[in-house]
């Protein structure tokens, strides 16, 4: 994973109206495995990962790395938000920019948790790296993700074909402080 750069990590837990964004902990292991093995979650990500493979690869606590937040609702993990440097593999214009990613357990869908968590993570990024442009890539068939991108303020830059499906590349313009 490409590093975000000079950010203070880990930050203090970020509290929203209903959630806490925090670093992964050992208690999140089962939920992370459930998330990555979920057929629903994997629909637009190349399919679910085999549970037995995940069990072997994750012997203890889930990986900790700058930009990886656990979305915690009432003490339980319901998803994760990831901020990392985009590689530009599929979209050269995305290379080097901060990329937003998110995965939530199906039982957490439809309650606005993803929007709340992503907005909080983007707020953290804006305070750490003011003016940083942020990109988001998703399949156009992923209606929920497309709605979330619009709700967060991402605007379409281009559509392209990759992995046998139409993809969407959007950008969140940085907010520049006024003098």
What would you call each of these model-derived segments?
Residues 75, 112, 142:
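Conserved G/P- and acidic residue-centered "switch" motifs that form tight phosphate/ATP-binding loops
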């Amino acid at each position: 994973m490409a590093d975000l750069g000079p950010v203070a990590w880990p930050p203090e837990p970020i509290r929203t109206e209903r959630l806490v964004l925090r670093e992964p902990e050992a208690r999140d292991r089962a939920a992370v495995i459930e998330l990555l093995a979920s057929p629903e979650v994997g629909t637009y990500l190349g399919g679910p990962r085999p549970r037995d493979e995940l069990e072997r690869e994750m012997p203890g606590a889930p990986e900790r790395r700058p930009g990886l937040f656990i979305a915690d609702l009432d003490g339980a993990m319901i998803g994760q938000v990831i901020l990392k440097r985009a590689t530009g593999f599929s979209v050269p214009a995305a290379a080097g920019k901060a990329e937003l990613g998110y995965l939530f357990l199906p039982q957490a869908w439809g309650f606005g948790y993803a929007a709340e968590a992503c907005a909080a993570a983007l707020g953290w990024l804006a305070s750490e790296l003011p003016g940083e442009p942020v990109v988001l890539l998703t399949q156009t068939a992923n209606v929920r993700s497309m709605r979330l991108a619009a709700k967060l303020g991402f605007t379409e830059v281009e559509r392209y074909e990759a992995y046998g499906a139409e993809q969407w590349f959007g950008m969140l313009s940085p907010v520049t402080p006024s003098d």
